[in-house]
Amino acid sequence: MKALDELTFDNRFARLGDAFSAHVLPEPIDNPRLVVASPAALALLDLDPAMADTQEFAELFGGHKLWADAEPRAMVYSGHQFGGYTPQLGDGRGLLLGEVYNAAGEHWDLHLKGAGQTPFSRMGDGRAVLRSSIREFLASEALHALNIPSSRAACVIGSDTPVWREKQERAAMVLRLAPSHIRFGHFEYFYYTKRPEQQKLLGEHVLAMHYPECLEQPEPYLAMFREIVERNAELIAKWQAYGFCHGVMNTDNMSILGITFDFGPFAFLDDFDANFICNHSDDQGRYSFSNQVPVGQWNLSTLAQALTPLISVEALRETLGLYLPLFQAHYLDLMRRRLGFTTAEDDDQMLLEQLLQLMQNSGVDYTLFFRRLGEESAEQAVARLRDDFVDIKGFDAWGERYVARVARDGATDQEQRRARMHAVNPLYILRNYLAQKAIDAAEQGDYSEVRRLHAVLSNPFEEQPGMESYAERPPEWGKHLEISCSS
């Protein structure tokens, strides 16, 4: 393990030049203190988690100090927001401190969110509030624990610095880790500003840093785009399988590595609702749960357009056509496992669609249904779960087909079935009301609940004694929390 002052930085993105980012120093927050830290994320930097409790740690990630070899940069990019193109966005409140290599040879971007104003703040104050910082921290680490690709969050640093949103709140900073912070919007920016040299330089950087295997292909940029399509298809399949609704799938929030990025008004489904809208600001439901699949393809098409100086239109169109089949294959594979199947049958998709429609009509808890489905034999589970459905006759008919399908699957050992299903069906997810309870306590200076919730969510598949309340259905008030883009 390293001491904090032993971290060494590389700044390869900064070396691309001022056309790509601006040099900005963090603006410190008043009286910085640790709210919560992720030992697993800190380990990616070879840091001892015990260091998080030191004042030096709070001052470093509260903007008061800086490593000598760090070169903080605010990145410039553009993007399509709710379907419309915005010519210039960029890091309006966050700074890329640089890259750190760990003992395993991995490189991790360190990005300090809430670090103050930048040239891209667009009239904003450059700050992040404690509320949104806690939500990003919890979501990042919860998704990782669910095996859903995501940026990581190493810590949240709180402060006494006042900021105004709908009311006065307090500023905080999040240390975000990711192999890259390059977004679809980076390529869009140089495409729409007609700067092909910078576009090519960015492409060369991404190939060398993140897709070196594509350099061996006859058409490296096309191979890179195919990888991006495949990764995003798999990512969104996992979102859909686990009921995660991102809320703001603008192209500036889409990662070229296919990881979940930029957490705002996200939510996990409580009751299954294919039309669920988690973003209170999304009046038209563009980013509803069911729309995430086509929006993912639409976003990839905007990236494809931006890559036309590097790749032929015909090749881009053909590669983009792989998205839906790839999504469907990944999604069905995940859902078969969630249903306890070890084999594939042609009618599995129909069986799944019938189940989801029954769940939608009855308001069945999405996470708990699948968890309970694996608690007992198929026959016993179906008999126990039927009372959750309004259309009992319809569920009974589905249950007969499901039990027959399980029998054909041939995996008869119940203990093995239980272990197999529990390994993919979480007991604990980040429900909005749990996050809100942790935020309410933290805003009063009590960080124990956010730390406890983080610990529970770090091990979502294993039953944790004494933590039964974290696996319950939400109270009625918890189902109707309005989350907006305000952060």
Swiss-Prot record:
Catalytic activity from the UniProt record: L-seryl-[protein] + ATP = 3-O-(5'-adenylyl)-L-seryl-[protein] + diphosphate; L-threonyl-[protein] + ATP = 3-O-(5'-adenylyl)-L-threonyl-[protein] + diphosphate; L-tyrosyl-[protein] + ATP = O-(5'-adenylyl)-L-tyrosyl-[protein] + diphosphate; L-histidyl-[protein] + UTP = N(tele)-(5'-uridylyl)-L-histidyl-[protein] + diphosphate
Keywords assigned: ATP-binding, Magnesium, Manganese, Metal-binding, Nucleotide-binding, Nucleotidyltransferase, Transferase
Protein residues bound to ATP: 90, 92-93, 113, 125-126, 176, 183, 262
The EC number(s) this enzyme carries: 2.7.7.-, 2.7.7.108
Active site: 252 (proton acceptor)
Gene Ontology MF terms: AMPylase activity; ATP binding; magnesium ion binding
Superkingdom classification of source: Bacteria
KW Transmembrane helix (keyword) present: no
Cofactors (names): Mg(2+); Mn(2+)
Binding site for Mg(2+): 253, 262
Main EC class the enzyme belongs to: transferase
Reported function: Nucleotidyltransferase involved in the post-translational modification of proteins. It can catalyze the addition of adenosine monophosphate (AMP) or uridine monophosphate (UMP) to a protein, resulting in modifications known as AMPylation and UMPylation.
Family: Belongs to the SELO family.
HAMAP family (UniProt xref): YdiU_SelO
Name of the protein described by the UniProt record: Protein nucleotidyltransferase YdiU
Organism this protein belongs to: Pseudomonas fluorescens (strain Pf0-1)
